[in-house]
Amino acid sequence: MDADRIVFKVKNQLVSVKPEVIVDQYEYKYPAIVDRQKPSITLGKAPDLNKAYKSILSGLTAAKLDPDDVCSYLAAAMELFDGTCPDDWTSYGILIAKKGDKITPATLVNIQRTDVEGNWALTGGLDLTRDPTVAEHASLVGLLLSLYRLSKVSGQNTGNYKTNVADRMEQIFETAPFAKIVEHHTLMTTHKMCANWSTIPNFRFLAGTYDMFFSRIEHLYSAIRVGTVVTAYEDCSGLVSFTGFIKQINLTAKEAILYFFHKNFEEEIKRMFEPGQETAVPHSYFIHFRSLGLSGKSPYSSNAVGHVFNLIHFVGCYMGQIRSLNATVISSCAPHEMSVLGGYLGEEFFGKGTFERRFFRDEKELKEYEAAESVKTDTALADDGTVNSDDEDFFSGETRSPEAVYTRIMMNGGRLKKSHIRRYVSVSSNHQARPNSFAEFLNKTYSSDPR
């Protein structure tokens, strides 16, 4: 019989079926540029820059912006921000610019234009007869791109977080080298009238292009990045979290993965480290692949690597990190099991400190110290890891090898110890939990645990 089939009875009738599930037709897509052409978009006819400025500024003042006109203006304004390429700049086999070339944000991409005229209406509330200065253009560009960052702020953020962010960004574009062009709080008012700027593909593309340019090129107006920085590694929260995790525990990626004791990590680790990607290439198109339209469904998002994401943030919660406590649990990716593993790893890598001597009076003292430490290491590696630290308060967990940590988990029946639960409850109960956050999960799951 087919090994994939199961047999059972329905009303005394023998039934044999092959269980199958719906195949996800919307597969994860790795960023790639197969034709060696720069990322491109198509916009309407290029406007007169000064006329466009006056139209967009009047729309911003009246909180009535035409997205197509905004995108057309942002693309046209790129010519105002020129800089010198510090080195040969290549990505995915494409030569973006050579060392010493004068470049603008438009150099990074291909912006095609049609003959379709923009609207360029004057909404009102503006009486500007003179042509704007470069500083005023820069302020308008900065304010428009700030709408992208505001639209990315989660609705779960409590209090006045979004208003405070808007105020800080406006303050940047009111002071030199920028110029004040609108009344304070205009940005937040405009955002409320259209809160979904990050979902407009062309606007997202231009925000990513500006960010990619200013992240590499030193420029008088680099502060424009305050609104676009969220396009860097967008939809890469799984990969970004893993990168931060290995820095915290001071291990290489290879060493860290040895502690991932769960079968569901296999597919995610394979997905996250697909060969041929420019994940470690500085200033690559990869960094902005979502905004530049190089991937429809990111394989590096928290949903794509949910078990890895959950584990990392449970470890972060164990250490009381606000970012982890506020993060949203991926509920379909074994959060209970990940919280157990997170407790053990949190204790092993953070709970006991990682202190060691690094500086010495002379080379002789250094060698003596290294010799003494090697003896301690040999002793630690011989430890079978069977000591229960709940029973022996002074057990220091000398070895943190994957084998020793795994043994400790198995010796406790794959369950958290009392000390882990106390720690989880302590950090989560003292935190204002957001809906579906790690703090809420830990509080609900372990606050009533009888252990």
UniProtKB/Swiss-Prot annotation:
Single annotated GO MF: RNA binding
Localization, UniProt: Virion; Host cytoplasm
Modified residues (Phosphoserine): S389
UniProt keywords, alphabetically: Capsid protein, Helical capsid protein, Host cytoplasm, Phosphoprotein, Ribonucleoprotein, RNA-binding, Superantigen, Viral nucleoprotein, Virion
Post-translational modification as stated in the protein's UniProt record: Phosphorylated by host CK2. Unphosphorylated protein N seems to have a better affinity for leader viral promoter encapsidation. Phosphorylation of protein N in ribonucleocapsid may stabilize the interaction with protein P, thereby playing an important role in viral transcription/replication.
Subunit structure: Homomultimerizes to form the nucleocapsid. Binds to viral genomic RNA. In nucleocapsid, binds protein P and thereby positions the polymerase on the template. Protein P acts as a chaperone on free protein N to prevent it from aggregation before encapsidating genomic RNA.
Note: Displays a superantigen activity in human and mouse, activating mostly V-beta-8 subtypes of T-cell receptor.
Protein name: Nucleoprotein
Organism: Khujand virus
